[in-house]
């Protein structure tokens, strides 16, 4: 029903934002990925939207890109994946990383996300793998596959050095995010060791 909302950012929280558009305040639920791309309050911005209509509520979801919105729609098309779970997935990984993990059949990466069990991860892979590889997402997928390989190599090395996988993942993800994924395996390991 709504393609996007273009207005002034009035309130900004990690899970939702309020945008003023022509004197009407819209509450849009956002992922951490979208939250991190937003400007300061009182700045003009545009969020692409998805409206979810239920018997007892109408909920607007906001996305910083059409790609993220399309991925959200694909995720909620999977049986057992609701809007909250899809938002959690988009908060845990960037759309590019999520697409790469689905395209590469990486169930372990999906299961690392809170609320995603083994069966749900497998269902997501089965239902979305072909859709993701055949869609416009493929350009980003190639670019992100390198980042996933760098991440996985660094994780493997840190685990071999004796760090727990959970702590290693936190450190690696923090460094990957701060470097926008543009980092070599060696530097990723070095920077992660400083945090661990």
How should each PLM-predicted stretch be described?
Residues 78, 92, 104-105, 131-135, ...:
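Conserved, well-folded catalytic cores of nucleic-acid-processing
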Residues 72-76, 87-90, 107-111, 155-159, ...:
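Amphipathic alpha-helical segments within well-ordered protein domains
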Residues 58-63, 83-102, 123-136:
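Amphipathic, charged-and-aliphatic alpha-helical interface segments
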Residues 101, 137-196:
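Low-complexity, acidic/Ser/Thr- and charged residue-rich accessory regions of DNA metabolism proteins
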Residues 1-77, 182-196:
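Structure-specific DNA junction-binding interface
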Residues 49, 79, 97, 132-136, ...:
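Conserved NTP-handling cores and scaffolds of large molecular machines
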């Amino acid at each position: 029903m709504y393609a996007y909302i273009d207005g002034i950012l009035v309130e900004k929280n990690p899970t939702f934002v309020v945008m003023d558009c022509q004197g009407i305040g819209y509450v849009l639920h956002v992922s951490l990925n979208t939250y991190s791309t937003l400007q300061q309050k009182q700045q003009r911005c545009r969020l692409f939207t998805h409206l979810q209509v239920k018997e007892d509520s109408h909920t607007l979801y906001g996305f910083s890109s059409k790609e993220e919105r399309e991925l959200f729609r694909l995720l909620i098309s999977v049986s057992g994946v609701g809007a909250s779970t899809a938002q959690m997935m988009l908060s845990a990984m960037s759309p590019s990383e999520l697409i790469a993990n689905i395209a590469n059949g990486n169930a372990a990466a999906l299961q690392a996300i809170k609320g995603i069990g083994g069966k749900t991860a497998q269902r997501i892979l089965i239902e979305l793998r072909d859709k993701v590889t055949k869609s416009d997402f493929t350009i980003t997928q190639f670019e992100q596959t390198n980042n996933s390989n760098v991440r996985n190599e660094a994780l493997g090395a840190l685990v071999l050095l004796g760090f727990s996988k959970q702590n290693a993942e936190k450190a690696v993800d923090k460094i990957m995010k701060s470097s926008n994924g543009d980092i070599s395996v060696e530097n990723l390991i070095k920077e992660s060791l400083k945090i661990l």
